[in-house]
Amino acid sequence: MPKNKKRNAPHRGGGGGGGSGAATSAATTGGPHRTVQPFSDEDASIETMSHCSGYSDPSSFAEDGPEVLDEEGTQEDLEYKLKGLIDLTLDKSAKTRQAALEGVKNALSSKVLYEFVLERRMTLTDSIERCLKKGKSDGQRAAAALASVLCIQLGPGLESEEILKTLGPILKKIICDGTASIQARQTCATCFGVCCFIATDDITELYSTLECLEGIFTKSYLKEKDTNVPCSTPNTVLHISSLLAWTLLLTICPISEVKKKLELHFHKLPSLLSCDDVNMRIAAGESLALLFELARGMESDFFYEDMDSLTQMLRALATDGNKHRAKVDKRKQRSVFRDVLRAVEERDFPTETVKFGPERMYIDSWVKKHTYDTFKEALGSGMQYHLQTNEFLRNVFELGPPVMLDAATLKTMKIPRFERHLYNSAAFKARTKARSKCRDKRADVGEFF
């Protein structure tokens, strides 16, 4: 087609191709139709996620984060929009239901709305249950993601227990269903771990969940019996999510159960370090570091028989220069396994600092890091806001009651933009110098040959 024809051609994105579902959702939310964005800021902030979801019109009002919501609308406006989205979760159109679920999830990730969610938890649970049972892959993923955020909003208690009792058997069925979508099973495994971590009050149910997740990720062990069979398969992403969810639940198990799991998996997990999937290697390495931390917490003189071979394998991964692997994967792997090696050999953990508002949280253990990473994946960019105001998360990380500051106090604490720019520039230079000492420059140069 000639260029002038292309220029004058009508735009196809807005008119008749949107469908009735999108028009209904735009009218319900009370805002103009917006262009669908394939990725959100939340997805961009999570480097280790294996999938990203597209957002339709019902969720577009929450894309700008809590600050924009505070400026553009009151609490009543937000709740009004959420009511419309909750109604759309029961729409006949599958795409509209999916977009509505994602919109509710985005809103609940950005704000703490305990009373609002408490009143409508049954409706939300019914919508999630229906999408998990009858929906396809994308719908099931959206429903499972919303279930995680719903439990985070409510925290531990009877309400979350009821949600887990309703959705738990369905999640378990999808996870173990070999005919279901891998992406849906992966999201359901993460959701099952998060919901069980928050809501379970029955030790038998906790052990049953652990066994369910074990039955998934231990299938990667079988690949190591034959060295000619590659460890990485289409199911690897599911195995990774199951392993990480299993590790999260292990942190709340009684000591007797932890000892049993350590005896069963301590000598099998290292086999996953030779997997050709970098995310599996990293997940296995971080899980091993956490298991060592738990074991040494129970027994200060804990002794691991194959320590020499394990440290040799970890050191090789921390200095990996394999030309057949992507440069980005190698850098990420080397960074993680330097910390894992220090944890196994020296019982050391590099303390991290998380800033949210006027507060700071220090992550000084593998258990705390893994817990933080799990909830960060569920909440995305809303994690900082929830750390400030969500009582459940503040109890998990031992932050105490929420700090209540008025607008005038916050304004006096705000640093001027120019001073922030100078501080960030100085911090950037210092960070660059510090990290340059840890980089293996010779390995990077060798990759070009």
UniProtKB/Swiss-Prot annotation:
Per the record, where are the segments of Basic residues compositional bias? 1-10
Keyword ATP-binding assigned: no
Tissue-level expression reads:
Expressed at high levels in the embryonic brain in the period related to neuroblast proliferation and differentiation.
Residues crossing the lipid bilayer are: none
- Which is one Pfam family of this protein? IFRD_C
- Native organism is Rattus norvegicus (Rat)
BP GO annotations? glial cell proliferation; muscle cell differentiation; negative regulation of axon extension; negative regulation of collateral sprouting; neuroblast proliferation; positive regulation of DNA-binding transcription factor activity; positive regulation of transcription by RNA polymerase II; skeletal muscle tissue regeneration
Q: What is this protein called?
A: Interferon-related developmental regulator 1
Q: Where is the composition biased (Low complexity)?
A: 22-31
- MF annotations from Gene Ontology: RNA polymerase II-specific DNA-binding transcription factor binding
Gly residues: compositionally biased ranges? 12-21
Question: In which domain of life is the source organism classified?
Answer: Eukaryota
